[in-house]
């Protein structure tokens, strides 16, 4: 697989391999903020309500690219250990592909079903989140802030970001919360919906916002911000939809309402609305970047489902045991932020 972007990001390892990690090109002289990095890693860590019981230390081990806590200009190579592996959980179903998981297409492509999802596992979002934390540091010095919240879990919805007036203070406050929602009531109801799961799973939607991008950042065609952001968002397991601004609501709009009018207020160019989500023609327009990422319900559930036995080629049933997230959107939030941060940093690097 080719590395991603100007930073040549590459993620290696699997869900049940001894190690996993990443390599990426990082400018020389970045003093790594360990507190920031560990905070972002903790936000995707298991242990929260609705997440897998799998426990890993998730401590970054620096192989190269760092001297005395500062990047030295060499390729940054960071790895993590996989210690809490239970491959035996998959032995009973090794010929039964889990519905809507990677199992069947991976079996056809590679000749086997990868243990724990292999390279298709959400475990690989750990190095992605680490890379995003490094990007957050670099972008912070450029005045860029990124934050997010759970917009929807099951049938419970949170208040949306104000598309024109979301502040960096609000984004910072959300990042400090263990269960980031704008409305306290939404947090309570979402947690109740997750706690009520009995062997099933829930889908969810994360809303992200980025502030401080200079007007014109991005480009045309596949060099545009939407293209870059989407390509990384869809690298996150379970993501099935990515929307910008009004997103699918554009289908019911007239242009007279969809267009974001411009005004001069106090000598400053402003917008009357932000249906474009801060991006026009692949370039930042100065308004907040608003992105919504929808996650499917976790495919691995304990309820009986229809499948097939690949050995006997007969119909079969499967109830998945093992340790799985009840709602992958919960830990997917940190991965989504990382993807947005990396895509924005990549746009800056393209123009350097």
Give residue spans per PLM region.
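Generic N-terminal targeting/processing segments that precede catalytic cores or assembly contacts
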Residues: 2-352
């Amino acid at each position: 697989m080719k590395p991603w972007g100007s930073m040549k990001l590459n993620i290696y390892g699997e869900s049940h391999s001894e190690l996993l990690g990443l390599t990426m090109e990082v400018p020389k002289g970045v003093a790594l903020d360990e507190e920031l990095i560990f905070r972002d890693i903790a936000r995707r860590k298991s242990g929260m309500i609705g997440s897998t019981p799998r426990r890993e230390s998730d401590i970054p081990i620096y192989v190269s690219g760092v001297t005395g806590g500062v990047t030295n200009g060499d390729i940054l190579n960071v790895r993590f250990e996989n210690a809490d592996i239970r491959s035996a959980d998959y032995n009973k179903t090794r010929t039964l592909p889990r519905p809507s998981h990677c199992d069947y297409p991976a079996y056809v492509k590679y000749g086997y079903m990868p243990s724990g999802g292999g390279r298709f596992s959400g475990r690989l979002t750990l190095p992605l989140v680490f890379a995003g934390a490094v990007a957050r540091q670099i972008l912070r010095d450029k005045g860029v802030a990124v934050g997010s919240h759970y917009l929807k879990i099951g049938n419970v919805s949170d208040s949306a970001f104000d598309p024109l007036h979301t502040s960096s203070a609000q984004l910072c406050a959300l990042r400090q919360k263990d269960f980031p929602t704008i409305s306290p009531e939404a947090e309570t109801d979402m947690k109740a919906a997750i706690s009520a799961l009995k062997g099933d799973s829930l889908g969810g939607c994360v809303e992200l916002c980025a502030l401080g991008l200079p007007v014109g950042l991005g480009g045309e065609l596949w060099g545009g911000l939407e293209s870059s952001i989407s390509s990384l968002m869809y690298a996150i397991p379970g993501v099935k939809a990515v929307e910008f601004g009004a997103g699918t609501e554009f289908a019911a709009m007239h242009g007279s309402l969809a267009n974001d009018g411009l005004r001069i207020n106090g000598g400053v160019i402003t917008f009357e609305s932000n249906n474009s989500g801060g991006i026009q023609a692949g370039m930042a327009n100065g308004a907040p970047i608003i992105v919504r990422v929808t996650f499917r319900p976790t495919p691995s559930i304990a309820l009986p489902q229809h499948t097939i036995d690949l050995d006997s080629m007969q119909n079969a049933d499967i109830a998945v045991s093992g340790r799985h997230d009840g709602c992958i959107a919960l830990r997917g939030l940190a991965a989504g932020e990382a993807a947005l941060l990396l895509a924005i940093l990549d746009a800056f690097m393209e123009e350097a």
